[in-house]
Regions:
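Aliphatic-rich helix starts adjacent to a transmembrane/signal segment
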Residues: 2-75
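Short linear sequence signals and composition-biased patches located at protein termini or domain-edge surfaces
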Residues: 50, 54, 58-73, 77-82, ...
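Short, surface-exposed coil-to-beta transition loops
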Residues: 151-154, 244
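N-terminal intrinsically disordered, cationic/polar leader segments
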Residues: 133-136, 153
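Broad, structure-driven detector of short, well-ordered beta-strand segments within folded domains
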Residues: 153-162, 198
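Short consensus segments that form the blades of beta-propeller domains
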Residues: 143-149
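Short hydrophobic/aromatic-rich beta-strand segments that constitute the beta-sheet cores
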Residues: 164-170
Length: 255
């Protein structure tokens, strides 16, 4: 009887070769680098959109403040009982609170800086207010004095070159700071503003149609200014040159 012998075979364990492992590592690194690049790009895009959104918000806010203030310029609670707006409080002309002396009867008034960064250009608006009319100043407060005797409220706008901020200071003629909360103290309205330049629209006698815009030093009769053209320089959040925005606002209560 023949006996068949079976020789057991050695079992070989399956595994990765060095080449296969290197290929797998390479693919993994490519995927990792791709995910990292995508994350960085998304993060940079978010930051850019955030900076752009902040810039646009600052532009809208600054122009809203100035537009509302100029629209109120020259306002009287009762035109029949008022002939002029008195401007008896003259702010200093230091860099901390520029302004100059506003002529009586004017709803808007401005001073030029002459190119000196230490004495920024300013824009003033004035209106008569009663405690019951609800007019809000540029710092968010209203006149809290008499309900029958109007006071002159003045908003003074300028740019602080040390902080690149649009500032506003409110004065109430001869009544002190008690007549309006925070009056007399400069307040930051909008950040990221490096410069403000203002031109004033004049019209021929007997006309409301503006035919020229002039610098503040050229205006001789401030109560006849029909429009205000404001140019604001905003700090570019992406570097490079400032972003310039120009807006023209009609003076509603001009003579």
């Amino acid at each position: 009887m023949n006996t068949v012998r079976h020789t057991p075979r050695r079992s070989h364990q399956a595994g990765f070769t060095l080449v296969e492992m290197m290929v797998a590592v390479t693919i993994g690194l490519i995927v990792l680098f791709g995910m990292t690049a995508t994350f960085v790009n998304l993060k940079n895009t978010f930051r850019s959109q955030d900076k752009l959104g902040t810039l646009q918000d600052n532009e809208r806010l600054a122009l809203t403040f100035l537009t509302n203030s100029i629209n109120e310029a020259g306002y009287y609670p009762d035109p029949k009982s008022a002939s002029t707006i008195t401007a008896s409080v003259a702010p200093t002309t230091s860099p901390a609170s520029p302004g100059g002396t506003m002529p009586a009867g004017a709803g808007v008034f401005g001073t030029a800086d002459g190119g000196a960064a230490t004495s920024p250009e300013s824009l003033q608006t004035a209106y008569a207010s009663l405690s019951t009319d609800g007019l809000i100043s540029c710092i968010g407060t209203s006149y809290a004095g008499s309900a029958t005797v109007a006071a002159t409220v003045r908003n003074i706008y300028y740019v602080d070159p040390t902080t690149n901020s649009l500032m506003c200071r409110v004065l109430v003629n001869g009544l002190g700071t008690d007549a309006m909360a925070n009056a007399g103290t400069p307040q930051v309205l909008v950040t990221g503003v490096s410069k403000m330049a203002v031109m004033y629209g004049l019209a021929p006698a007997g006309s409301m149609q503006v035919n020229e815009y002039v610098s503040p030093g050229t205006v001789t009769a401030w109560n006849t200014v029909k429009a205000v053209r404001i140019t604001l320089n905003f700090v570019n959040p992406f570097g490079g040159a400032d972003i310039v925005r120009t807006h023209t606002i009609n003076v509603m209560n001009s003579n």
